[in-house]
Amino acid sequence: MAHFMTPEQCRAARGWLDVSQTDLAQAGGVSLSTVRDFEKGRRVPIGNNMNALRAALESKGIKFTENGITGPLAS
C-alpha cells in the first residue's frame, strides 16, 4: 500500500524540486485550488487527485517514506 502524502510532505517536495503550486497543479492535472487547499490543510484531495499529485512529484524523483521524503541529488 502506498504511503499517504501529507500537506507538509507536498510542500517539502515542491521546495526540494523548486516547483510552484501552479506547476504542480498543471503536472498533476488538478486545479490550483486543490494544491493550495491541501497544502494549507483545508481539505484532502479525492483519491484520483491525490494519486495524480503524488505521481507528478514521484515522476520528478521524489520518494515518499514513512519518515518523510527523499529526492534527487543536485547535479
Predicted regions: what is each one?
Residues 48-65:
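DNA major-groove recognition helix of helix-turn-helix/homeodomain DNA-binding modules
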Residues 1-5:
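A detector for short, charged/polar N-terminal pre-domain segments
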Residues 18-36:
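Short alpha-helical DNA-recognition segment
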Residues 8-23, 52:
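Short basic helix-loop element that most often maps to the first helix and adjoining turn
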Residues 31, 42, 60:
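The DNA-recognition helices of helix-turn-helix-type DNA-binding domains
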Residues 12, 43-45, 66:
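A charge-rich, low-complexity, intrinsically flexible signal that marks solvent-exposed coils, linkers
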Residues 62-75:
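Helix-turn-helix/homeodomain-like alpha-helical modules used for DNA recognition
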